[in-house]
C-alpha cells in the first residue's frame, strides 16, 4: 500500500469527506480557519501545508475511527499518511534540566482532546517535569534566593522524611518564583492536561478505567502526601507521575484576575475530583497542605540550553 509522505490539498479534502464534516466543522476540528481549508482544497495537489499543519492532520487521521480511516484509504486510492498509526511511546525523549537536574519528558506538538467535551486543541511542543517539585528541590531554591520557606518547615528546614514528598504550603506566586529561578515556567492548563491524558484523550492518566488504587486520593486512606515516584502504575502516556492525586498543582493559566487554575486532585480529594479534564481554580494567595506544583519549558528554549546554543 502506497504511503503519502506529505499532505496536500487533495488528501485534506479526502479526509474531510471521509470524516463527513462541512468545511466549518472540519476547520473547527483542526483548529484552523475555514478560509485555510477552502484554500487547501481549491489548490488540491498543488499546495502543501506548513509542518505545524501537517502534524495536526497526522493527528486528526490517527485519532479517527476505523470507518473514517477506511473511507479515507478508499478516497485516496489506498494510500495512508506516513506515520499516521504511530503510537506515542511512554516516557520517550527524557532529558535532565541543565540547571535543576530534574527529569523532564518531551510532549510533541499535536492535537489533544481537551476538557469534559473532548474538544480538539493544538498545543506546540514542550517539556514537562516527570515528578512534582519535592521539598528537597524547593530547598535548593530557598537556599539560593532567600525565599521564605513553607510554613511547616521547622527553622527553615523540611523534615528529612519528607525530602522526596511534594512541597506544599506554597502559593501560586511561590510556585511561579521557583519556576522562574529554575529557568522554567508553570505549565498551562492545556499543557498539563495533554501530558496527563495523551493525544487520545484518556479519562485518566493510565486509561479509561476508574482505578483509585493507582493514585493517592481520599478513598485510599493514606491521609498525607506520598513520595513523588510512588504510583508507577498510575503514570500518564508520557510517563509523568501523580497527575491524579497526591497534591493539587498550580498552573500558569489565569481563570479570572487574581485566580489561577489547578489540576489533578490531591490526597484530600475524592477520586472523582482528580479527573484531569475537570476545572478547578483558586486565588493566587491560597496556601494549603494539599497544593504543590511541577514545571514545564518550551521545547525550543530547553533544547537550545541542552545543546549549548545560548
Which residues does each PLM region occupy?
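Recognition helix of helix-turn-helix/homeodomain-like DNA-binding domains
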Residues: 31-49
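Conserved hydrophobic/aromatic packing and binding residues within compact polymer-binding modules
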Residues: 12, 26-27, 37-40
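Short, structured beta-strand segments at or near domain termini in extracellular proteins/domains
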Residues: 289-305
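Short, charged recognition helix plus adjacent turn
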Residues: 68-93
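DNA major-groove recognition helix of helix-turn-helix/homeodomain DNA-binding modules
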Residues: 49-70
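Functional-site microenvironments in short loops/helix caps that host divalent-cation chemistry
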Residues: 105-107, 113, 148, 154-289, ...
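A short glycine-rich, aromatic-capped structural motif
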Residues: 95-152, 169-173, 195, 245, ...
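A short, Lys/Arg-rich alpha-helix, primarily the initiator
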Residues: 1-19, 55-58
Amino acid at each position: 500500500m502506497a504511503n503519502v509522505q506529505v499532505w496536500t490539498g487533495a488528501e485534506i479534502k479526502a479526509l474531510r469527506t471521509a470524516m463527513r464534516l462541512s468545511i466549518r466543522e472540519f476547520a473547527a476540528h483542526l483548529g484552523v480557519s475555514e478560509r485555510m481549508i477552502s484554500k487547501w482544497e481549491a489548490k488540491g495537489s498543488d499546495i502543501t501545508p506548513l509542518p505545524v499543519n501537517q502534524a495536526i492532520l497526522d493527528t486528526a487521521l490517527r485519532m479517527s475511527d476505523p470507518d473514517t480511516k477506511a473511507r479515507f484509504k478508499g478516497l485516496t486510492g489506498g494510500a495512508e499518511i506516513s506515520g499516521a498509526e504511530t503510537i506515542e511511546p511512554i516516557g520517550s525523549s527524557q532529558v535532565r534540566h541543565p540547571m535543576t537536574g530534574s527529569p523532564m519528558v518531551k510532549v510533541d506538538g499535536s492535537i489533544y482532546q481537551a476538557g469534559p467535551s473532548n474538544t480538539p486543541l493544538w498545543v506546540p511542543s514542550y517539556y514537562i517535569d516527570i515528578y512534582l517539585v519535592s521539598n528537597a528541590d524547593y530547598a535548593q531554591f530557598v537556599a539560593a534566593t532567600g525565599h521564605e520557606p513553607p510554613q511547616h518547615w521547622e527553622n527553615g528546614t523540611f523534615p528529612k522524611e519528607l525530602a522526596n514528598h511534594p512541597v506544599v504550603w506554597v502559593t501560586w506566586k511561590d510556585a511561579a518564583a521557583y519556576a522562574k529561578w529554575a529557568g522554567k515556567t508553570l505549565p498551562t492548563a492545556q499543557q498539563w492536561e495533554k501530558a496527563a491524558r495523551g493525544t487520545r484523550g484518556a479519562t485518566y492518566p493510565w486509561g479509561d478505567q476508574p482505578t483509585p488504587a493507582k493514585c493517592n486520593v481520599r478513598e485510599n486512606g493514606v491521609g498525607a502526601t506520598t513520595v513523588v515516584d510512588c504510583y508507577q502504575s498510575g503514570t500518564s502516556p508520557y510517563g509523568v507521575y501523580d497527575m491524579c492525586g497526591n497534591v493539587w498543582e498550580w498552573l500558569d493559566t489565569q481563570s479570572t484576575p487574581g485566580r489561577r487554575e489547578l489540576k489533578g486532585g490531591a490526597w484530600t480529594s475524592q477520586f472523582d475530583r482528580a479527573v484531569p479534564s475537570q476545572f478547578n481554580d483558586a486565588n493566587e494567595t491560597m496556601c494549603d497542605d494539599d497544593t504543590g506544583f511541577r514545571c514545564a519549558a518550551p521545547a525550543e528554549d530547553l533544547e537550545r540550553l541542552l545543546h549549548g546554543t545560548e
